[in-house]
C-alpha cells in the first residue's frame, strides 16, 4: 500500500494506472475510520481494480474552530485498517498541500440551492467546503467511481448534482449506513461520547424509526412528527439541532408527488453532534 502526501506524486501514480488501463475507485474520508468507512472500501473493491482512500481533515468545511481542533486525527491507525482491507493508495495531504495559496484565495465550487437549505441553512459555507475539496480530489485522482455513505444524505445529493452539472465522468455509488447492534450509526464522532452518552445515543435512531413507522402508516403531518421526535430527544438528554422530513430526490418539502421521503436528524449529546438519516417509501 502506497501512502502519498503530495499531489505531484499522486498525479504520477494516477498517470501510470491510467496508462495500464486500471479502473479506479475513490473513497474520500476525513480519517478516524470506523466500520462505515470500511464498508465503503469493501464496496469499492467490487467496482474497481484499484482502490484509493483519501484522508484529509478539510478545514474549509468546518464552521466552528473548536470542531476542527477537536476532530480526531488517527492517521497511523487508519492506515493499518486500510492496509488490512488491501487498499492500494492512501492520499493523506496536508492543508498546505491542498490549499497552497490559502483558503481565502481558493477557487470555490458551490452547488446552488441544495447547499443552502436544510443543514446548509444553519451551517453556511459547510457544503461549499465539501464540494470544493471533493472536486479537487476528483481532478487529482480521476476515479471511475467514487463512494459515499448515505448517513450524510444531503451531502450525497449535493455531490451527485455537482457531478452532473460539471460533467464529471464519475459514477457516484451510495453505500447504506452501517449500524451497531443498538441501531446507532457508526461515526467518527462516536469516540467523543462518554460511557453514559453511548448508552443514550441509540435514542436518535429510535426517534427516527418512530417517524418512519408513522410515515409508512400514512401520517404525513410533518410538523407533528418532528415535534414528537424532538420531544423524545429532549427527554433523553439530547439537544435537537436539525430535524427534517423531505422528498428523498429533491430535498424539497413532501408533496403529493413524493414517492420516497428521507428523514434527516442531527442532535447534540453533550458536546458531540450526531447525525443520522433514513429513507422511507411512501408508495
UniProtKB/Swiss-Prot annotation:
* Molecular function as annotated in GO: ATP binding; pantoate-beta-alanine ligase activity
Sorted UniProt keywords: ATP-binding, Cytoplasm, Ligase, Nucleotide-binding, Pantothenate biosynthesis
Chain positions recorded as ATP binding sites:
30-37, 149-152, 178, 186-189
CDD domains referenced in this protein's UniProt entry, alphabetically: PanC
- State the active site: 37
Main subcellular location: cytoplasm
| Record's function text | Catalyzes the condensation of pantoate with beta-alanine in an ATP-dependent reaction via a pantoyl-adenylate intermediate.
The name on file for this protein is Pantothenate synthetase
Task: Give the source species.
Answer: Proteus mirabilis (strain HI4320)
* Biological classification of the source: Bacteria, Pseudomonadati, Pseudomonadota, Gammaproteobacteria, Enterobacterales
Amino acid at each position: 500500500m502506497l501512502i502519498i502526501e503530495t499531489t505531484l506524486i499522486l498525479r504520477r501514480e494516477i498517470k501510470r494506472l491510467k496508462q495500464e488501463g486500471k479502473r479506479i475507485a475513490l473513497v474520500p474520508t476525513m480519517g478516524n475510520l470506523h466500520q462505515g468507512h470500511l464498508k465503503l472500501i469493501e464496496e469499492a473493491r467490487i467496482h474497481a481494480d484499484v482502490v484509493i482512500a483519501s484522508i484529509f481533515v478539510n478545514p474549509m468545511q468546518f464552521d466552528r474552530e473548536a470542531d476542527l481542533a477537536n476532530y480526531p486525527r488517527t492517521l497511523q491507525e487508519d492506515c493499518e485498517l486500510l492496509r488490512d482491507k488491501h487498499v492500494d493508495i492512501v492520499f493523506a495531504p496536508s492543508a498546505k498541500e491542498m490549499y497552497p495559496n490559502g483558503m481565502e484565495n481558493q477557487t470555490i465550487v458551490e452547488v446552488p440551492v441544495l447547499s443552502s437549505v436544510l443543514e446548509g441553512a444553519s451551517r453556511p459555507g459547510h457544503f461549499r467546503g465539501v464540494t470544493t475539496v471533493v472536486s479537487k480530489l476528483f481532478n487529482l485522482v480521476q476515479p471511475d467511481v467514487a463512494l459515499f455513505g448515505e448517513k450524510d444524505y444531503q451531502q450525497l445529493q449535493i455531490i451527485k448534482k455537482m457531478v452532473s452539472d460539471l460533467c464529471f465522468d464519475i459514477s457516484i455509488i451510495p453505500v447504506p449506513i452501517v449500524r451497531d447492534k443498538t441501531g446507532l450509526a457508526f461515526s467518527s464522532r462516536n469516540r467523543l461520547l462518554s460511557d453514559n452518552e453511548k448508552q443514550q445515543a441509540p435514542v436518535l435512531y429510535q426517534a427516527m424509526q418512530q417517524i418512519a413507522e408513522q410515515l409508512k402508516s400514512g401520517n404525513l403531518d410533518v410538523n407533528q412528527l418532528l415535534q414528537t421526535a424532538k420531544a423524545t430527544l429532549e427527554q433523553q438528554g439530547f439537544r435537537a439541532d436539525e430535524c427534517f422530513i423531505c422528498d428523498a430526490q429533491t430535498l424539497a418539502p413532501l408533496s403529493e408527488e413524493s414517492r420516497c421521503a428521507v428523514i434527516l436528524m442531527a442532535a447534540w449529546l453533550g458536546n458531540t453532534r450526531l447525525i443520522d438519516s433514513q429513507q422511507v417509501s411512501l408508495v
